[in-house]
Amino acid sequence: MNDTVLVLNGPNLNLLGKRQPEIYGRETLADVEALCRETAAGFGLAVDFRQSNAEHALIDAIHEFRVGSAGIVINAGAYTHTSVALLDALNTCEVPVIECHISNVHRREAFRHHSYISLAATSVLAGFGTHGYALAIRHLAHLRAGRPA
């Protein structure tokens, strides 16, 4: 198993810090990437940090990391609620998958309450702000140490 965590971000997360800051905060995706790299380094892990607005690019990344990586942290954005294709890709994973949402999706619009991603996720984090990414990486390190989910 290699020591790289895939941190995968879906549509519109490239606008983090600019789009609806009252919901998502003012931190940018670059800030989140720095947080992820710093957190992972503390556990001897590396991060491959990606964002795409294209569903096929997210699927390709999942396929690339589904076996042999340290795990996947995914914030699929709006695809969380719509993408059976992402679910199918995640169901092929032999590594832990942590679903991460900046906002508490369960306190928002009803259509956001359903997640296809959760059906394949080892664990789910929502509503912790961007700190949720660090918690997700810590949890992957916890799982790698042989502790149960």
From Swiss-Prot:
SUPFAM superfamilies: Type II 3-dehydroquinate dehydratase. Its EC number is 4.2.1.10. GO terms for biological process: amino acid biosynthetic process; aromatic amino acid family biosynthetic process; chorismate biosynthetic process; quinate catabolic process. The active site is at residues 24, 101. It catalyses: 3-dehydroquinate = 3-dehydroshikimate + H2O. One of its GO terms (molecular function) is 3-dehydroquinate dehydratase activity. The record marks 19 as: Transition state stabilizer. Pathway: Metabolic intermediate biosynthesis; chorismate biosynthesis; chorismate from D-erythrose 4-phosphate and phosphoenolpyruvate: step 3/7. PROSITE patterns: DEHYDROQUINASE_II (PS01029). Coiled coil: none annotated. Keywords: Amino-acid biosynthesis, Aromatic amino acid biosynthesis, Lyase. Substrate binds at residues 75, 81, 88, 102-103, 112. Catalyzes a trans-dehydration via an enolate intermediate. Homododecamer. This is 3-dehydroquinate dehydratase. It comes from Methylobacterium radiotolerans (strain ATCC 27329 / DSM 1819 / JCM 2831 / NBRC 15690 / NCIMB 10815 / 0-1).
